[in-house]
Amino acid sequence: MKARKELDRSLQSLEGLIAQSNAFDLLGLVRMYTVPPTLEGHRESESQSSPATLELVASMIRHRAAGDDAPAPDPSTDPGEIVIAAERAIDAHLWLLLSESTEGHHPLAELAGQFRMTELRVRGRQYQSVQSTVEDELFGVAAVSELMDRHLGFSYNDLQRVRVAFGEQWSQNRSGSLEELHRLYEEHKDDEPTDELRAQLQAAMHTAMFKPGVSMTVTAEEISQRSGLSSETCTSVLDAFAVPFDTTRTPIEAAQAFLRGDNELLLRNLLKDSRGRYFGVGGDLGIDGLRPIFEEAIKPVQKAWDRYQKHRGVVAERLAARHLQAVLQPDRSYESIKYFRPIPGTDAVTLGSACDRPATHGEPAEADLLMVIDDIAICVEVKAAAISTSARRGSVLRLAKDLEKTVGDARSQADRLADLIERNHGLWVPDEGWLDLSEVREVRSIAVTLEDLSSLNCSLDALVRARVMPAGRLPWVVSLHDLIVTTRILDRASELLLYLRRRTDSEVATRYSGIDELDFVMLFVEGQLWVDLDPAVMHAKYPKAPRLTGADRARYRKEAQLTRVGTHTDDLDAWMYYTDGLVDAPAERPSFRSDDGMDELVDALAAHRGQGWLSTSTDLLNGSSEQRASIMSSITRLLRAARGDGKRHSLFVALPGPWGFSAVVFGTGHGARDSGALAALSDYAAAKQYQLEVDRCLTVLLNAEGAVLGTAYRGRGFRNLRRWSCGRLRWACRIRQPGCASHRLTPVGQVGDFAAGLGELAEASVCG
């Protein structure tokens, strides 16, 4: 196979290139070539380097025969040759992985291959402030910090101090060598160069650019002086995240193990030489290794492990709840709620509100978090278990088992709760009785993992094919880190619900594929995470719409293609780096905002918080920029007319979509004292809801300046209005009475081009 030959050839070339030069000098040159000197202006989408390149070279140098004792690199040494050989080896291996995954017969083979590729190439998947938030909660408590001290030889506070000192000392050492070169230049830039000056410049240049090993390493003594900790404690911290040189393997064997997933530098990202110097291969000290190393150390002690596991689960649940509640501001929130679920083999309806013995017909169950916001219920399950080492190295069977324990269990538990709420409109809670949830019309599920599984979570359709999750209702599967970042960006309840709807919509799940959840979030923020809806399905849902043409169906088939989601986090990175204090250049927070006025309307509905505000606000945000602008333009005309004549005016807006057919009726009254305006407007809305078979309709009464005065909501569908008399319907729908005018509006609602037909149903009336 061509890829196999290229891999062997590249590794042999790499072995020769790294055979003799000083280890840390050589690694320093490669680091200078592959790692940006600063995050200022860094854009991941434009970066051509990968942390895996430096790690592969470091793994081979660690196991070479010369060890850490070799002369400095010759000035003619070209690190570019080393980098090119390493990148060729990695690329060839990725081709082999791709071939293996597509030829595998297990339903998870493709996903396992994608997981291995991500584990090989992606590093630094946590923003500093978010990582600190999680680690502080997890390790900052006294009991866990004491466990760390007992089993690792240092406390969490010790680790934090060493981390800070390591970064500061590295920067000082590195800048010192460059400052000497800069000093000589500034002092003598106008002087005639002498032989002595040339020698000094050459020596400074050689130290800074060809012998960077000294300036890129630190010692425990340096860290001790800077941190104020003892040298022994600093050594314990550094050694916990360091690997020594080892000649028991050959460089080729080390490279092959690295590419198989046995990466010694993934968790322990320091390389230590025989003189006690530490070279940082990448990222902050222990950035990806603290939790796995600590858990590995305490797992043999059963009592300590059990106590920590319980604490770990509580922390993950608490952090998930805290950040979701901050955005959603639920009307009711239940953490660790206990309820009765159906006994296996029995129907969920046996546990309806009329059940007289729920403890007999059901069995105890617990949900991590249930939130009710308006008529929306959100079920959240949190899993703190880790993915095993063998799964990370490509074991398909072990990956399947680990995913079933995390994603699969979270999905089934959330789905079980959602099914009970949808079918019974409530739950039986032990010792408390019936929990009425009859107002809930829509149920969504979130599965949160403490482990970063982005490359797996982003492929919901593959999880369905692998039977980790059944077809049908899909949860949003997200890591705790990405959930925290998402809630910092989508800080409106309506925005987060819209993302939740789109992200778990079956059309989106099967049409978008990626390896990073935050790329999906930023794609959504940019207004690009959407699909044209199946016109046949939409017409079946809304039969009063015009008949579809062959051109409609042909366009849908043409556009129904898989989209590979690349890197979209550049703006997010810039903002996070700035807020974390890693760069000086100010950066704006990415936000799902528009300048069409819809944001102000959504905020006004949220502030009023009348029934139906959340689902309707989300439906309004779901439109395209053109559709939102059309709605706001129509509202502007409505208010202008109200200010002009002081009469009642109304605007009907249809919002058909994949999550139901909703509508909004905006209206004004006869000035501030028109007490009957809302009731009359609500009757008109009900008639239109019945006429067009609308699922839910929000009525919004505005004053002439656009402030919300009151709302009314019907969320149980048009069928509940059949008890109305024909006379009342005709009265409520008085669109063409003397003194009233009606006109067509620009189509609204997001259903692709199909919206044009339903737009004909959007009407405005002006009534005296």
Locations of the language-model features?
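Acidic, metal-dependent phosphodiester-chemistry machinery of nucleic-acid enzymes
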Residues: 1-329, 340-347, 360, 397, ...
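Hydrophobic multi-pass inner-membrane translocation pores used for secretion
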Residues: 353-358
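Cell-envelope/extracellular polymer assembly enzymes that use nucleotide-activated donors
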Residues: 368
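Acidic, metal/cofactor-coordinating or nucleic-acid-engaging core segments within structured domains
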Residues: 402-438
